[in-house]
Amino acid sequence: MSFVVIIPARFSSTRLPGKPLVDINGKPMIVHVLERARESGAERIIVATDHEDVARAVEAAGGEVCMTRADHQSGTERLAEVVEKCGFTDDTVIVNVQGDEPMIPAVIIRQVAENLAQRQVGMATLAVPIHSAEEAFNPNAVKVVLDAEGYALYFSRATIPWDRDRFAKSLETVGDTCLRHLGIYGYRAGFIRRYVSWQPSPLEHIEMLEQLRVLWYGEKIHVAVAKAVPGTGVDTADDLERVRAEMR
């Protein structure tokens, strides 16, 4: 099947300045992400960035770059600019791969594209089971609950679903119903155009989760269990050191 990968790579980061260009074992992080995307079989891979240094690093590795504005409020808005500049048709399948995921398995990039292509839905994503209480109660681990057909009912930083009987006895174990959302999305290009035409929703501001805008406006998001679990993403200097060790 045919799909396009877009990798947003914003240069500024409060916790890790210049994050796309941090060195991981001799290569900029964004180049590692580009290489994982190439392994997915995508027809085209575009790095969307607001910084010339990132563009130069990607082009030196043989990658394609689309320069974008620096004032986007979300990654989806940056994708929308790329969709318009490249003139993608509404039915083009786009996979958004985060630029700080150098250990993302290529198999799940393709998985989310295939899941979207097989359904009449504008957006698809992935999740993995949560097995530890620490992760279940961590607000940085976004949880998702699904309906009987595998569509998202809600995403939250809170612990959902709340296992009333289990948690009344102990907060140290979790059952088998808790899922952690992975920050990888598949969209049809036309859906991205619609998304950015909607006003932000109150829920996305409360939770700071932009995918809640989709549910707020009554649209569906398909969620499948990922075929592989991604390695550590890079948000902080500690994450960076951990990834360097894991990729050595």
Curated annotation (Swiss-Prot):
It comes from the Bacteria. Coiled coil: none annotated. One of its GO terms (biological process) is CMP-keto-3-deoxy-D-manno-octulosonic acid biosynthetic process. Pathway: Nucleotide-sugar biosynthesis; CMP-3-deoxy-D-manno-octulosonate biosynthesis; CMP-3-deoxy-D-manno-octulosonate from 3-deoxy-D-manno-octulosonate and CTP: step 1/1; Bacterial outer membrane biogenesis; lipopolysaccharide biosynthesis. It is an enzyme of class 2 (transferase). Signal peptide: none annotated. Keywords: Cytoplasm, Lipopolysaccharide biosynthesis, Nucleotidyltransferase, Transferase. Its EC number is 2.7.7.38. GO terms for molecular function: 3-deoxy-manno-octulosonate cytidylyltransferase activity. It catalyses: 3-deoxy-alpha-D-manno-oct-2-ulosonate + CTP = CMP-3-deoxy-beta-D-manno-octulosonate + diphosphate. SUPFAM superfamilies: Nucleotide-diphospho-sugar transferases. It holds the Pfam family CTP_transf_3. Activates KDO (a required 8-carbon sugar) for incorporation into bacterial lipopolysaccharide in Gram-negative bacteria. Belongs to the KdsB family. NCBIfam families: kdsB, PRK05450.1-3, PRK05450.1-5, PRK13368.1. This is 3-deoxy-manno-octulosonate cytidylyltransferase. It comes from Salmonella typhi. The gene is kdsB.
